[in-house]
Amino acid sequence: METYTFEPQRVCSKRIDFALDEQARLHDVKFLGGCPGNLPAIAKLVEGKDAREVADILRGNPCGSRGTSCADQLSIAIDQALAARSA
């Protein structure tokens, strides 16, 4: 299992930590800062799920006028982690 840390942009959370197993499933998603109800719920919902599917679902989900959201930023983090694994 590989762990990743991502610094999101233009959102309330300051850091996203997560792990990917050998089959590219998400584990141990943690948001530092941000909404204390929604973000732990997202982490529970995505636990053990296919990272590509999660990124596809969360990508483009905005929060207000920010043009992004913590969920959208998680999709970016996943995309970057998967790209790094393939490189």
Where are the regions that the model predicts?
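Active-site- and interface-proximal helix/loop "cap" or "latch" segments in soluble metabolic
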Residues: 7-86
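Short, hydrophobic/aromatic-rich segments at coil-to-beta transitions
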Residues: 1-5
